Amino acid sequence: MALLLVSSSSSYALRVTIFLSFFFFLCNGFSYPTTSSLFNTHHHRHHLAKHNYKDALTKSILFFEGQRSGKLPSNQRMSWRRDSGLSDGSALHVDLVGGYYDAGDNIKFGFPMAFTTTMLSWSVIEFGGLMKSELQNAKIAIRWATDYLLKATSQPDTIYVQVGDANKDHSCWERPEDMDTVRSVFKVDKNIPGSDVAAETAAALAAAAIVFRKSDPSYSKVLLKRAISVFAFADKYRGTYSAGLKPDVCPFYCSYSGYQDELLWGAAWLQKATKNIKYLNYIKINGQILGAAEYDNTFGWDNKHAGARILLTKAFLVQNVKTLHEYKGHADNFICSVIPGAPFSSTQYTPGGLLFKMADANMQYVTSTSFLLLTYAKYLTSAKTVVHCGGSVYTPGRLRSIAKRQVDYLLGDNPLRMSYMVGYGPKFPRRIHHRGSSLPCVASHPAKIQCHQGFAIMNSQSPNPNFLVGAVVGGPDQHDRFPDERSDYEQSEPATYINSPLVGALAYFAHAYGQL
């Protein structure tokens, strides 16, 4: 990322600090979180819970409003944001307004956006019944994504998978409301296949169709019909989208794991959404070819094998689909790999107890793994069974305790005694790597902030003037260290796919501790 060097003199730093402090009050309209009711996390009614999971749940969903692209509604709660990207898609004469910015930049990447949507939907499918007043907000967050995905898949055998030139966008530090970099549009089709992004999009639409089946049946039918056609396209024209669009999607969201995992994942969601025997047969015939038995212990926007195994295991354990019996063993293998001290455990943990997969945005694996642990524990409980790791047995309760340890670490039970969610607890990241959050809001600074002007603020040590409430950052390193530096995108950047599985986990714990 190209950075503009700025003066390091104390007088310059002081001017920037005063500048941002002024805009903090104008943009947020309240004092610092430790004294604001919006950020109050000390009103627990249940002494058994160390954390206010309900408060964290509310904020984890609110975060998505800060990532919105397009025309914002009148009930927008993240009030420092304004409309943006209103001409998206015009480069190819299509309407691609809406959707989410993936992280701290102003690009709409379809691959992680679809995964975010799938995981938000799965969170609601498994734990939405526990969310009470937050269920509607979660559905709104899902629909903001699916409305966009319907636009992106409106033409047969074509998916618009990205809006914006990431390389040019990353050379600027400007608010989404000001962005003037080229809004290039990239697509996959018969000539440039993208089975990975297409199958993930099909999974997202199918999962969302389940979410809206009762509350909005007509919309649900639209989603499911589109999911079926998009999956057919993904399966017929095989290939990774990054092979044809490499300069534009790599290294940002390259499909490193290939497309096989997404085809299995997409088929699993369509089987769940349609109950059509053809998807079950597809899985039976193609499962091994698509990597059902491959050993991998990472679940995230790139590799979906673990999620597919656990989803398919439910069909065997709870719905008694005997032909999927082998997936119980595959799912157990994944779970065994993340249980500390279990036979075949292969997951690293920090000295403070955080699951650690990689330096870049590690918290995404913490939240996704925690969600899978809780979801699998739910399935195991329903079937009155356990996890088998060699000669050892692990109960659903053990899985829940591991997930709780991870969520609690994220919320503040860690060596630094800080929350990694913005706005939760008295101490949390103040300099997140996020353009809109770090720059003065439009209400306080109506004048345009040019492409390179923003780097003066990006490189400063001043706290962000706008709170992206609920944002979970990449997190600490393998030694539990966190510098809270805006330039450190690996540790300080939030992302939609970090939050989406966390929504389900927080709903579970909020209910379990009587907060919902």
Swiss-Prot record:
It is an enzyme of class 3 (hydrolase). SUPFAM superfamilies: Six-hairpin glycosidases (SSF48208). The keyword Hydrolase applies. Its EC number is 3.2.1.4. It comes from the Eukaryota. GO terms for cellular component: extracellular region. Gene3D superfamilies: 1.50.10.10. It catalyses: Endohydrolysis of (1->4)-beta-D-glucosidic linkages in cellulose, lichenin and cereal beta-D-glucans. This is Endoglucanase 17.
